[in-house]
């Protein structure tokens, strides 16, 4: 392979235009980027073949979902595993259309797609197709998490094929725009499915205070989003004097009754994903990555990094489908942890954070919230959440939350909350002013809260004293944004930059129809939103 690539799917892409050199800002090489394109090409070919005479099955959807999830930012940096996936996709297509490869007519009906056609398409077509592609990549992560718990939705699965098929067709804006909005619709179903999977498996989250101090002795840090992997790790470390600490998007796990019942699930280590290379440098413990966001490990801690599921990095120890975490546990015992309790703080100096304010908790006190809004005790609600990242300017979200008036409430979710989740904003009406709803997929909970409040007031969500101030980084943020647009939610503030893959005409459509606006200065945006 040559050393040129093209990728503009994440917020940190070079110059807000695209990564085109020997490596992306995320750390993936040009060869990995081109293999991800090849995998996507093969997945479009597989989607085309799902209309064949041979019926698709659960394995078809499982492979399609895994392939899409593998191409999400900061998931896989491993050429070998991506090549293996490409071979599996081709084998599955051959099963669905066994006579296609030997057919003499060469109609091209089930061929893999040439991704260069997408990257070089007319800019508005490229923009809409990119929204579809990146949206279903993000949605695939949620479908994958639900799938490992035994939950699936046929309509969601079939939409993956429909969306991929659309990307491969020579369609214009009129045909593509409805598919873009359908990504939002199907992602809502997918998030509802994952919410059901998590809550039926682990109980409904309840508020909990999570310490940031790491106790002395051996421990393991688990990062990512997969609660199933955490559950298995907790079971395998029971009675072994090895404590478990969450990291990044795993923090909300502490709110689930079936997870927090384990006494050795002790607390949370570190902050958001982009700080891992600094925070893990001298960590006397192994780190297990269950999903994104993995950054290329530094030599100072590379021997302590373990991956599982779709996460993969060359020469890192990978835990296979049997989920036998013995090597991770042995590494924890070998390293021994800290000799004394080690206090840590969040970005703003707090020594504990709270989580677990899912829809059941907030709606359980909805009468108090409604009365407080009616009486004027609560003037406004903000949803400030989304992905964190390394680009300068993300301190906007810290300053925005700090400046919210005392008669307002801040709901948050996803790893963007680490910018401010250790702040003490006090209480209002007996409730914390700052409430962590959960992981990025728990946007479903936030949506249910907003819809329930709108119903209680007899108005639409857009008529509530509610503003959404969102940060984005990767593809799960794309599918969540499309879900909000599908629901007709308007006047969202988005930052720290607008996506490079959104063309001026598509952006103009979003501005005119949904009132999307970039963030500016915290004090200016607050002034506008509180009008």
Feature names for model-found ranges:
Residues 2-32, 36, 41-44, 178-531:
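Anaerobic metallocofactor- and corrinoid-dependent redox/one-carbon enzyme cores
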Residues 43-201:
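Electropositive, gly/pro-rich neighborhoods at or near active sites that engage anionic ligands
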């Amino acid at each position: 392979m040559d050393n040129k690539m093209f990728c503009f799917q994440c917020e940190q892409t070079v110059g807000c235009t695209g990564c085109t050199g020997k490596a992306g800002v995320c750390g993936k090489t040009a060869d990995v980027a081109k293999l991800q394109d090849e995998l996507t090409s093969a997945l479009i070919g597989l989607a085309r073949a799902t209309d064949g005479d041979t019926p698709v099955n659960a394995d078809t959807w499982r492979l399609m979902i895994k392939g899409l999830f593998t191409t999400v930012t900061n998931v896989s940096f491993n050429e070998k595993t991506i090549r293996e996936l490409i071979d599996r996709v081709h084998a599955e297509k051959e099963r669905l259309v066994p006579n296609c490869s030997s057919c003499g007519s060469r109609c091209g009906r089930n061929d893999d797609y040439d991704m260069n056609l997408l990257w070089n398409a007319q800019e508005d077509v490229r923009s809409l197709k990119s929204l579809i592609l990146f949206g279903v990549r993000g949605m695939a992560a949620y479908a994958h998490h639900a799938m490992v718990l035994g939950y699936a939705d046929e309509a969601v699965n079939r939409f993956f094929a429909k969306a991929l098929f659309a990307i491969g067709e020579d369609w214009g804006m009129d045909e593509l725009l409805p598919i873009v909005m359908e990504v939002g619709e199907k992602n809502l179903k997918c998030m509802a499915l994952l919410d059901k999977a998590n809550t039926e498996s682990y109980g409904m989250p309840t508020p909990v205070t999570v310490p940031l101090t790491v106790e002395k002795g051996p421990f393991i840090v688990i990062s990512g989003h997969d609660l199933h992997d955490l559950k298995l790790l907790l079971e395998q470390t029971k009675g072994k004097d090895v404590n478990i600490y969450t990291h990044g998007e795993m923090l909300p796990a502490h709110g689930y009754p079936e997870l927090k019942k384990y006494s050795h699930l002790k607390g949370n280590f570190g902050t958001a994903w982009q700080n891992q290379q600094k925070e893990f440098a001298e960590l006397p413990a192994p780190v297990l990555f269950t999903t994104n966001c993995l950054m290329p490990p530094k030599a100072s801690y590379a021997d302590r990094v373990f991956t599982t599921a779709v996460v993969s990095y060359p020469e890192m120890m990978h835990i296979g489908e049997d989920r036998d975490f013995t090597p991770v546990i042995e590494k924890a015992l070998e390293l021994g942890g800290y000799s004394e309790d080690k206090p840590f703080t969040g970005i703003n100096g707090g020594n504990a954070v709270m989580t677990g304010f899912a829809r059941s908790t907030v709606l359980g006190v909805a009468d108090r919230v409604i009365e407080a809004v009616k009486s004027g005790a609560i003037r406004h609600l903000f949803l400030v959440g989304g992905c964190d990242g390394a680009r300068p300017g993300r301190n906007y979200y810290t300053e925005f939350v700090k400046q919210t008036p005392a008669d307002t409430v801040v709901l948050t979710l996803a790893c963007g909350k680490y910018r401010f989740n250790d702040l003490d904003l006090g209480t209002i009406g007996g409730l914390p002013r700052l409430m962590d709803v959960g992981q990025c997929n728990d946007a479903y909970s936030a949506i249910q809260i907003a819809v329930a409040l709108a119903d209680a007031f007899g108005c639409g969500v857009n008529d509530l004293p509610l503003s959404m101030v969102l940060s984005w980084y990767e593809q799960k943020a794309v599918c969540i944004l499309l879900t909000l647009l599908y629901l007709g939610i308007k006047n969202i503030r988005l930052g720290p930059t607008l996506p490079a893959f959104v063309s001026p005409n598509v952006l103009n459509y979003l501005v005119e129809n949904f009132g999307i606006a970039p963030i500016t200065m915290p004090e200016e945006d607050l002034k506008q939103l509180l009008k």
